[in-house]
């Protein structure tokens, strides 16, 4: 009785489509159980086709590409530091506008479609800030730490330095010739 019920299963499965797009891709490319030789292992067909090496969806499953950037910025209007998740596609080919949570101002991050004429042909925040003489710091990785020295210059002291006091230990970021 079980054999009779399972005989019609491949026919039923050929008509069923999963709802999720990623499963549809797997389903459409040979992930159905094999019927050749009346093999009795339904799950084995899935396991066999999903572990095959080579081109196709099974090989592409292990490759993960981030589709978003994590943008961290400080608003120059109110000084609020915030973080936004933006699409890579929009950053490189579209328009990205973020809203500051502190003052509710809108900030243009990227304009690849030419919507804003006051940017003078600049396409993204990197080009805009470079034209102003400012820097954009890119940090790669999830556990990355970024330290930026904002005020470059010698520290000023209220007391007059005594003999030999102006030569202190070297700063951690500077190197001295030996």
Curated annotation (Swiss-Prot):
<dbReference type="InterPro" id="IPR024158">
    <property type="entry name" value="Mt_import_TIM15"/>
</dbReference>
<keyword id="KW-0479">Metal-binding</keyword>
<feature type="region of interest" description="Disordered">
    <location>
        <begin position="151"/>
        <end position="178"/>
    </location>
</feature>
<dbReference type="Pfam" id="PF05180">
    <property type="entry name" value="zf-DNL"/>
</dbReference>
<dbReference type="GO" id="GO:0006457">
    <property type="term" value="P:protein folding"/>
</dbReference>
<dbReference type="GO" id="GO:0051131">
    <property type="term" value="P:chaperone-mediated protein complex assembly"/>
</dbReference>
<keyword id="KW-0862">Zinc</keyword>
<dbReference type="GO" id="GO:0030150">
    <property type="term" value="P:protein import into mitochondrial matrix"/>
</dbReference>
<dbReference type="GO" id="GO:0008270">
    <property type="term" value="F:zinc ion binding"/>
</dbReference>
<feature type="binding site">
    <location>
        <position position="78"/>
    </location>
    <ligand>
        <name>Zn(2+)</name>
    </ligand>
</feature>
<keyword id="KW-0143">Chaperone</keyword>
<feature type="binding site">
    <location>
        <position position="100"/>
    </location>
    <ligand>
        <name>Zn(2+)</name>
    </ligand>
</feature>
<feature type="transit peptide" description="Mitochondrion">
    <location>
        <begin position="1"/>
        <end position="49"/>
    </location>
</feature>
<dbReference type="GO" id="GO:0051087">
    <property type="term" value="F:protein-folding chaperone binding"/>
</dbReference>
<keyword id="KW-0863">Zinc-finger</keyword>
<keyword id="KW-0496">Mitochondrion</keyword>
<dbReference type="GO" id="GO:0005739">
    <property type="term" value="C:mitochondrion"/>
</dbReference>
<feature type="binding site">
    <location>
        <position position="103"/>
    </location>
    <ligand>
        <name>Zn(2+)</name>
    </ligand>
</feature>
<dbReference type="GO" id="GO:0005829">
    <property type="term" value="C:cytosol"/>
</dbReference>
<protein>
    <recommendedName>
        <fullName>DNL-type zinc finger protein</fullName>
    </recommendedName>
</protein>
<dbReference type="GO" id="GO:0050821">
    <property type="term" value="P:protein stabilization"/>
</dbReference>
<comment type="subunit">
    <text>Oligomerizes in a concentration-dependent fashion. Interacts with HSPA9.</text>
</comment>
<dbReference type="InterPro" id="IPR007853">
    <property type="entry name" value="Znf_DNL-typ"/>
</dbReference>
<feature type="zinc finger region" description="DNL-type">
    <location>
        <begin position="64"/>
        <end position="161"/>
    </location>
</feature>
<dbReference type="GO" id="GO:0005654">
    <property type="term" value="C:nucleoplasm"/>
</dbReference>
<keyword id="KW-0809">Transit peptide</keyword>
<feature type="binding site">
    <location>
        <position position="75"/>
    </location>
    <ligand>
        <name>Zn(2+)</name>
    </ligand>
</feature>
<comment type="function">
    <text>May function as a co-chaperone towards HSPA9/mortalin which, by itself, is prone to self-aggregation.</text>
</comment>
<dbReference type="GO" id="GO:0044183">
    <property type="term" value="F:protein folding chaperone"/>
</dbReference>
<dbReference type="GO" id="GO:0005634">
    <property type="term" value="C:nucleus"/>
</dbReference>
